[in-house]
C-alpha cells in the first residue's frame, strides 16, 4: 500500500507578503488587480476570506465585498524563491515529488526510512521544517492514493493535516460529496445531483455501464474514485504543458492597433517565462486568446516550432478580423504549448 502526502501552502502568495511585511498580517489583503484596473484575485489571506474574497474572483467583486481590501500587485520572484526552498525541503525526504503549482505538490514516501517510515510523522516534520526555515505554514493530507491525499490536505486548514488510513477509506468515501473529487466542477456536480448522485456512496450503487453511457470516460473516473481507486503514480518528471501570459484591460479596445500594441508588450514576458522552463522542452504550438466584452472568448493556435512574435501577431490579426465582430476586447493572451523531446516523433506522425 502506498503512502502519499499532498502538501498545500496556506494562502501562499499572501503569506509571503505578510511574512515580509508584518503590518499586513491582521488586515484583509489580496494579490491581483488594482482599484483602477480590472483583473482577478490570485490569492487572499484569511482576514479577506472572512468577507467572502476568494481566488479567481474578479477584483471588482472582491472590492464590493471588502471595500477596505488592500490589493498588492504580486512579487513573483519572491514566491518562486520560497517555492524553491519548499521543494528543497521535500527533497530531503523523497525524490518522488510531483509539483502541481508553486504552492502544492504530491510526495510519495512509501519507501522512505525517515520518521520510522510513518507518512503522518513525515508530513508533520515537513510542515514544521517549512515553518522553521521560511516562517510560512502549510497543510497536508496523507492517504494511500493521490486524489484522497489532495482532498485530505484541505480538511484541516490552515496549518494542519488530515490522515486517511487504508482502513478509513471505505467509510470516508461513503459520505464524500462528489463535488470534492478533483475534476468534478459545478456543471458536472449539478448534473450528477439531478440524477440523485451526490456522494461517492451513491456512485458505488451505480452500474459502471450506465456511468460510461452517460459520462463517457469521465464515468469510469467517477466510478474508480468512488471505489478509492487511483493508480496514478507520483510523477517527478511531470511535464509542464504550456506557458502563457495574458492581460485584462482597464478599458475594452475596439481597434486592431491597440491589440497589436498589447501583444508587443506581452511578448517579452512570454519570452521570459519560457526561458524558465527546462531547455529540453520544445514548442509544439503557439497561439493567442481574445476575451470579448460579452465574456465569450476564443483561442487560435497552430503548429510552430519556435517562438515568433510576427507569427503571433499574424494569428491575432486573423482572429481579430474573423471572430470579433463588433465586440470590444477586454483580455489579450499569448501562449505556447510545449513538447517533450520523447514525444516529438508522435506529434510529427500525428500531423
UniProtKB/Swiss-Prot annotation:
<dbReference type="InterPro" id="IPR053848">
    <property type="entry name" value="IMS_HHH_1"/>
</dbReference>
<comment type="function">
    <text>Poorly processive, error-prone DNA polymerase involved in untargeted mutagenesis. Copies undamaged DNA at stalled replication forks, which arise in vivo from mismatched or misaligned primer ends. These misaligned primers can be extended by PolIV. Exhibits no 3'-5' exonuclease (proofreading) activity. May be involved in translesional synthesis, in conjunction with the beta clamp from PolIII.</text>
</comment>
<keyword id="KW-0227">DNA damage</keyword>
<dbReference type="GO" id="GO:0006261">
    <property type="term" value="P:DNA-templated DNA replication"/>
</dbReference>
<keyword id="KW-0234">DNA repair</keyword>
<dbReference type="InterPro" id="IPR043128">
    <property type="entry name" value="Rev_trsase/Diguanyl_cyclase"/>
</dbReference>
<keyword id="KW-0479">Metal-binding</keyword>
<dbReference type="GO" id="GO:0003887">
    <property type="term" value="F:DNA-directed DNA polymerase activity"/>
</dbReference>
<keyword id="KW-0548">Nucleotidyltransferase</keyword>
<feature type="site" description="Substrate discrimination">
    <location>
        <position position="13"/>
    </location>
</feature>
<dbReference type="Pfam" id="PF11799">
    <property type="entry name" value="IMS_C"/>
</dbReference>
<keyword id="KW-0460">Magnesium</keyword>
<feature type="binding site">
    <location>
        <position position="8"/>
    </location>
    <ligand>
        <name>Mg(2+)</name>
    </ligand>
</feature>
<keyword id="KW-0239">DNA-directed DNA polymerase</keyword>
<comment type="subunit">
    <text>Monomer.</text>
</comment>
<dbReference type="GO" id="GO:0000287">
    <property type="term" value="F:magnesium ion binding"/>
</dbReference>
<dbReference type="InterPro" id="IPR050116">
    <property type="entry name" value="DNA_polymerase-Y"/>
</dbReference>
<dbReference type="InterPro" id="IPR022880">
    <property type="entry name" value="DNApol_IV"/>
</dbReference>
<dbReference type="GO" id="GO:0005829">
    <property type="term" value="C:cytosol"/>
</dbReference>
<dbReference type="InterPro" id="IPR017961">
    <property type="entry name" value="DNA_pol_Y-fam_little_finger"/>
</dbReference>
<keyword id="KW-0808">Transferase</keyword>
<dbReference type="InterPro" id="IPR001126">
    <property type="entry name" value="UmuC"/>
</dbReference>
<keyword id="KW-0235">DNA replication</keyword>
<feature type="domain" description="UmuC">
    <location>
        <begin position="4"/>
        <end position="185"/>
    </location>
</feature>
<keyword id="KW-0963">Cytoplasm</keyword>
<feature type="binding site">
    <location>
        <position position="103"/>
    </location>
    <ligand>
        <name>Mg(2+)</name>
    </ligand>
</feature>
<dbReference type="InterPro" id="IPR036775">
    <property type="entry name" value="DNA_pol_Y-fam_lit_finger_sf"/>
</dbReference>
<dbReference type="GO" id="GO:0042276">
    <property type="term" value="P:error-prone translesion synthesis"/>
</dbReference>
<dbReference type="InterPro" id="IPR043502">
    <property type="entry name" value="DNA/RNA_pol_sf"/>
</dbReference>
<keyword id="KW-0515">Mutator protein</keyword>
<dbReference type="GO" id="GO:0003684">
    <property type="term" value="F:damaged DNA binding"/>
</dbReference>
<dbReference type="Pfam" id="PF21999">
    <property type="entry name" value="IMS_HHH_1"/>
</dbReference>
<feature type="active site">
    <location>
        <position position="104"/>
    </location>
</feature>
<comment type="similarity">
    <text>Belongs to the DNA polymerase type-Y family.</text>
</comment>
<dbReference type="GO" id="GO:0009432">
    <property type="term" value="P:SOS response"/>
</dbReference>
<dbReference type="Pfam" id="PF00817">
    <property type="entry name" value="IMS"/>
</dbReference>
<protein>
    <recommendedName>
        <fullName>DNA polymerase IV</fullName>
        <ecNumber>2.7.7.7</ecNumber>
    </recommendedName>
</protein>
<keyword id="KW-0238">DNA-binding</keyword>
Amino acid at each position: 500500500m502506498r503512502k502519499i502526502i499532498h502538501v498545500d501552502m496556506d494562502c501562499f502568495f499572501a503569506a509571503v507578503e505578510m511574512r515580509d511585511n508584518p503590518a499586513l498580517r491582521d488586515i484583509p489583503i489580496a494579490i491581483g488587480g488594482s482599484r483602477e484596473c480590472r483583473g482577478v484575485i490570485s490569492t487572499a489571506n484569511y482576514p479577506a476570506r472572512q468577507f467572502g474574497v476568494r481566488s479567481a474572483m474578479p477584483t471588482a467583486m472582491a472590492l464590493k465585498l471588502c471595500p477596505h481590501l488592500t490589493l498588492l500587485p504580486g512579487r513573483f520572484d519572491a514566491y518562486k524563491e520560497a517555492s524553491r526552498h519548499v521543494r528543497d525541503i521535500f527533497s530531503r525526504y523523497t525524490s518522488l515529488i510531483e509539483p502541481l503549482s508553486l504552492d502544492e505538490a504530491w510526495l510519495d514516501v512509501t519507501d522512505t526510512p525517515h520518521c520510522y517510515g510513518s507518512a503522518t510523522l513525515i508530513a508533520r516534520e515537513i510542515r514544521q521544517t517549512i515553518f522553521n526555515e521560511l516562517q510560512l505554514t502549510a497543510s497536508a493530507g496523507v492517504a494511500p492514493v493521490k486524489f484522497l491525499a489532495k482532498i485530505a490536505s484541505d480538511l484541516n486548514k490552515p496549518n494542519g493535516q488530515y490522515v486517511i488510513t487504508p482502513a478509513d477509506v471505505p467509510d470516508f468515501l461513503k459520505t464524500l460529496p462528489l463535488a470534492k473529487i478533483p475534476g468534478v466542477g459545478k456543471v458536472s456536480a449539478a448534473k450528477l445531483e439531478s440524477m440523485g448522485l451526490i456522494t461517492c456512496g451513491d456512485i458505488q450503487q451505480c452500474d459502471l455501464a450506465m456511468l460510461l453511457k452517460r459520462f463517457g470516460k469521465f464515468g469510469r473516473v467517477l466510478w474508480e474514485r468512488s471505489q478509492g481507486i487511483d493508480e496514478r503514480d507520483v510523477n517527478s518528471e511531470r511535464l509542464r504543458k504550456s506557458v502563457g501570459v495574458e492581460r485584462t484591460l482597464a478599458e475594452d479596445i475596439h481597434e486592431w492597433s491597440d491589440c497589436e500594441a498589447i501583444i508587443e508588450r506581452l511578448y517579452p514576458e512570454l519570452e521570459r517565462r519560457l526561458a524558465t522552463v527546462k531547455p529540453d522542452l520544445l514548442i509544439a504550438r503557439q497561439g493567442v486568446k481574445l476575451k470579448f466584452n460579452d465574456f465569450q472568448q476564443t483561442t487560435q493556435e497552430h503548429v510552430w516550432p519556435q517562438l515568433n512574435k510576427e507569427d503571433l501577431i499574424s494569428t491575432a490579426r486573423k482572429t481579430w478580423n474573423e471572430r470579433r465582430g463588433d465586440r470590444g476586447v477586454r483580455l489579450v493572451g499569448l501562449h505556447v504549448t510545449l513538447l517533450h523531446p520523447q514525444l516529438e516523433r508522435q506529434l510529427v506522425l500525428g500531423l
